[in-house]
């Protein structure tokens, strides 16, 4: 979590070509993007994580995203993931050995994610509430660490959600912790 907080950017890699996904992860690292999340929806995602870990070393922040079950989490950690990102609240991840950014949107989901040991709450989809919603959440959850997640496409980029094709493209998104990073 400290590394993510320091770098303020988490690149998301998702696609159907595992070789391209691995090249994307290593290229991002070479270009100074210190934290990369490989979505488990990527074809052969665990192999991509494993190979990226072998190429980039033990200090690289390589996360597994779209973790939906404890079995997903265990396989991702075994492959070398140094953090997990879930799209929703997932039971059974306490004690997994790596930080978990747990997806939540409503106060009920946030309370549950915190009770389950989420290192941070991935406010997703953050665009539904915006800054006012986040400010409102800070009142009942003053100790909660929130990660605001949005897609940040370049104009005309294949990363744009409007132009991302079914072949699977690389998307880059920011993960800005809204507590302790601003």
Residue ranges and their predicted role:
Residues 33-38, 77-79, 98, 106-134, ...:
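Glycine/Thr-rich beta-alpha phosphate-binding loop at enzyme active sites
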Residues 52, 56, 93-97, 137, ...:
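Hydrophobic positions in alpha-helices of CheY-like receiver
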């Amino acid at each position: 979590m400290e590394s993510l907080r320091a770098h303020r950017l988490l690149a998301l890699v998702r696609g159907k070509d595992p070789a391209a996904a691995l090249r994307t992860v290593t290229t991002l690292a070479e270009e100074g993007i210190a934290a990369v999340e490989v979505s488990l929806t990527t074809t052969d995602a665990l192999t991509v994580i494993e190979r990226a870990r072998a190429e980039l070393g033990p200090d690289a922040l390589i996360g597994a995203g779209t973790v939906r079950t404890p079995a997903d989490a265990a396989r991702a950690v075994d492959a070398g993931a140094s953090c997990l990102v879930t799209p929703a609240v997932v039971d059974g991840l306490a004690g997994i050995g790596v930080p978990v950014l747990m997806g939540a949107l409503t106060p009920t989901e946030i309370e549950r994610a915190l009770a389950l040991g989420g290192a941070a709450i991935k406010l997703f989809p953050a665009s539904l509430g915006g800054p006012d919603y986040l400010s409102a959440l800070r009142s009942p959850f003053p100790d909660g660490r929130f990660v605001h997640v949005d897609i940040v496409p370049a104009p005309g980029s294949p990363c744009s959600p409007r132009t991302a094709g079914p072949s699977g493209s690389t998307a880059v998104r920011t993960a800005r912790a809204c507590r302790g990073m601003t």
